[in-house]
Amino acid sequence: MPNLKQVIDVLETLYPLRYAEEWDEPGLIVGDLSHDVHRIVFAADPTSAIIDKAIATGADLLITHHPLFFRSVHETSGLGFRGDIVRRLYQHGCGLWVGHTNADAAYRGVGQAAADYFGLIEIGRASCRERV
């Protein structure tokens, strides 16, 4: 069984963090890299209800498209809803990895999947920022 680091390595090979817009904060938010990953739950948003479902199903990792945080956070005491989400995930041994604008921009990412679905032929980037 792969551990969290191995799963993250695959995710970040497919969806490199360097593809993220400057304002975005994708990647591993919560998790112990040495923990084994048996079950993964996917969702659009890391809402409290989604966290409940991930915990109830025994997920070791929750992968969401939208981030839990858009700005720097200086505490996760559990007093706010984001802190509560981090606390609950940590207590139940469930990691959280976010693939947002990096997943949008990656080859075979969200943008490419949408283009394929709609049968688009001439495809280009909407961002002026050059990718490294």
What are these regions (language model features)?
Residues M1-R131:
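Hydrophobic structural segments
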